Regions:
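N-terminal leader/linker segments that initiate helical-solenoid repeat arrays
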Residues: 8, 18-85, 89
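Position-specific recognition of the canonical hydrophobic site in helix A of tetratricopeptide repeat
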Residues: 38, 72, 99, 106, ...
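Structural signature of tandem alpha-helical TPR/SEL1-like repeats
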Residues: 41-44, 75-83, 108-117, 142-150, ...
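Conserved structural position within tetratricopeptide repeats
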Residues: 53-55, 85-89, 120-123, 153-156, ...
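Conserved small/polar residues in nucleotide/adenosyl-binding loops
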Residues: 245-252
Length: 252
C-alpha cells in the first residue's frame, strides 16, 4: 500500500510540474507576441496584456514583470510602470519587480533611484544576478571601485559566471588597469561568449602589458573570424614588429 501511495504522490508531482511548464510556455508565447503588437497596434497590445494576466496569472510576478519589460523595451514608460506596480502589489518583496523598477529608473536617467532598486533586489534575493550586473553598469564610470566590489560579491556566489568576468574586464579596461583587465578577459575571451570587441580589447591589453606572443595569438584568432578587421590586422602587425625587435635585441 505504501508503494502505491508513493507512486501516486510521485505521479501527482510530475503531472503538476508538467502543467506548470505548459502554463509558463503559454504565457511566454503570449509575451513574445505582445512585443510585436506593442509596436504595430498599441490598443490591441493593451487588450492582449490584460488577457494574459486574467485568472490564475493575476499575481504571476514573472509574467507581470515580463510584460513590463516588453513595454519598457518599446519605450512605453507609463505602461511599464503600471505593470511594475502590479508586480509589486502581487509580491512586495519581489526581486524581479525591483529590477524592473530599477530598469525604468535607468530609462528615466535617474541613476540614484535605479541603484537603490538594484540594491533592494539583491536584499530580497542575494542571488539576483541581473541586479548585480545592472548596479555595476550604473557605477562603472562614476565609481568603478563600487562597481567592482559589487561584481566581486557576485563572483563569490557564481565563480563560473562569465558575464561577471565580462563586466569586470570592461571596467578594468575603462580604468586603464590592463593587468586586471587581462586576468578578467582570460576567463572568457577565448570562449563562445566573447565578441570581436572583447577580443580586440583583450589583444590590446596584452600588447600594452608587453605580452606580445599572447596578444598575437588573440589577434590571429580574431582574424580567423574576420580577416578584414582593421584593428586585428594592426595588432598583428604591431606584435610581429615587437617580437622581431625583441628577438633581434636578444641576438645582439
Amino acid at each position: 500500500m505504501k508503494r502505491v501511495q508513493m507512486f501516486l504522490a510521485g505521479a501527482f508531482i510530475a503531472v503538476g510540474s508538467l502543467y506548470a511548464q505548459s502554463s509558463d510556455a503559454e504565457w511566454q508565447a503570449g509575451v513574445a507576441k505582445l512585443k510585436e503588437t506593442i509596436q504595430t497596434n498599441p490598443a490591441q497590445a493593451a487588450e492582449e496584456a490584460e488577457h494574459l494576466i486574467k485568472g490564475k496569472n493575476k499575481k504571476n510576478v514573472e509574467l507581470l514583470v515580463a510584460i513590463g519589460d516588453a513595454y519598457l523595451n518599446a519605450d512605453k514608460i507609463p505602461e511599464a510602470q503600471e505593470y511594475a506596480a502590479l508586480a509589486r502589489k502581487a509580491n512586495g518583496k519581489s526581486a524581479l519587480a525591483s529590477v524592473l523598477e530599477g530598469n525604468i529608473a535607468v530609462k528615466q536617467k535617474n541613476a540614484g533611484l535605479a541603484s537603490q532598486k538594484y540594491e533592494e533586489a539583491i536584499y530580497f534575493d542575494p542571488k539576483c544576478t541581473e541586479a548585480y550586473l545592472k548596479y555595476a553598469d550604473i557605477y562603472k564610470s562614476a565609481n568603478a571601485s563600487l562597481a567592482i566590489e559589487k561584481l566581486n560579491q557576485l563572483k563569490d556566489l557564481e565563480p563560473s559566471n562569465t558575464a561577471v568576468d565580462k563586466k569586470l574586464a570592461e571596467i578594468y579596461y575603462l580604468k586603464n588597469d590592463f593587468n586586471k583587465a587581462v586576468e578578467a578577459y582570460a576567463n572568457f575571451a577565448m570562449g563562445p561568449t566573447a565578441t570581436e570587441e572583447d577580443l580586440v580589447k583583450y589583444a590590446f591589453a596584452l600588447f600594452l602589458n608587453h605580452d606580445f606572443d599572447k596578444s598575437l595569438e588573440v589577434a590571429n584568432m580574431g582574424l580567423q573570424k574576420n580577416a578584414r578587421h582593421a584593428a586585428f590586422n594592426r595588432l598583428a602587425m604591431y606584435n610581429y614588429t615587437c617580437l622581431l625587435y625583441t628577438s633581434d635585441a636578444a641576438d645582439d
